[in-house]
């Protein structure tokens, strides 16, 4: 019992550290469809430019396998150690959450709000960042246990929409 409590406290401390780093660094660079040959030199260039948060996306088109994404997450995580936090993006399934965790991801970013994905992310001790568009979806994401919510898709909404959502 005491061992489990200590383990839970360690998981919470690790998650709190990831949250504080996301709040501190704010910018998450997104890696999508980058070859294994280019991923580390691209990550190093971003790191040298001050980026400390990187997201490797799962390819839902089937062009790149889940294992390919896991390999890239693992390459970045092992190369940079604690100097950089890598997460997985475009995560749609609980299986992808587990694959990302095993590869070294510290946070999960999804384009949607899926209660099962959020729950699995929290069970794995990772930070959950689902996507949501409406105030109802945003509230639902938080109710499911999301640590942050990504406004998605946001490209055509404008600052007025964001201000309106934040107003209440």
What are these regions (language model features)?
Residues 2-86, 91-103, 123:
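Conserved N-terminal beta1-alpha1 strand-loop-helix module at the mouth
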């Amino acid at each position: 019992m005491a061992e489990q409590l200590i383990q839970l406290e360690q998981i919470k401390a690790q998650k709190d550290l990831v949250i504080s780093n996301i709040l501190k660094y704010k910018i998450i660079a997104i890696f999508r469809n980058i070859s294994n040959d280019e991923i580390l030199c691209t990550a190093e260039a971003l790191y040298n430019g001050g980026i400390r948060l990187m997201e490797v996306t799962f390819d839902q088109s089937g062009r790149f396998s889940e294992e390919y994404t896991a390999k890239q997450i693992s390459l970045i995580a092992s190369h940079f150690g604690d100097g950089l936090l890598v997460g997985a993006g475009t995560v749609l399934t609980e299986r992808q959450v587990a694959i990302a965790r095993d590869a070294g991801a510290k946070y999960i970013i999804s384009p949607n709000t899926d209660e099962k994905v959020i729950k699995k992310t929290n069970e794995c001790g990772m930070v959950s960042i689902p996507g949501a568009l409406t105030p109802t979806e945003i509230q639902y994401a938080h109710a499911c246990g999301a640590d942050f919510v990504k406004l998605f898709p946001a490209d055509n909404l404008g600052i007025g929409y964001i201000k309106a959502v934040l107003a209440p």
